């Protein structure tokens, strides 16, 4: 019984995490699948669109490292670039 409850909680947590981390929460998982299909059609285009830094208001993983993750002129404060 305990194992079943733990499995249900784990599945719910992973589902919520996937929906929260999606770019557009209105589309949820549908948006993730459409991106994968587009990248398969033109893999070179997906490489060119990637950036090495985070834009303004994007998540940055470690505010104590300063502006290492944020684009030029932005600082990492409270886990987002500003």
UniProtKB/Swiss-Prot annotation:
This is Omega-conotoxin-like TxMKLT1-031. It comes from the Eukaryota. It comes from Conus textile (Cloth-of-gold cone). GO terms for cellular component: extracellular region; host cell presynaptic membrane. It is found in: Secreted. Belongs to the conotoxin O1 superfamily. The keyword Coiled coil does not apply. GO terms for molecular function: calcium channel regulator activity; ion channel inhibitor activity; toxin activity. Omega-conotoxins act at presynaptic membranes, they bind and block voltage-gated calcium channels (Cav).
């Amino acid at each position: 019984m305990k194992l079943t409850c733990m499995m249900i909680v784990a599945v719910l947590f992973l589902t919520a995490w996937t929906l929260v981390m999606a770019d557009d929460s209105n589309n949820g998982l549908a948006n993730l699948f459409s991106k994968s299909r587009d990248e398969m059609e033109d893999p070179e285009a997906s490489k060119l669109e990637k950036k090495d830094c985070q834009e303004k208001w994007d998540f940055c993983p470690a505010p104590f490292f300063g502006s290492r993750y944020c684009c030029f002129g932005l600082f990492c404060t409270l886990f987002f670039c500003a």
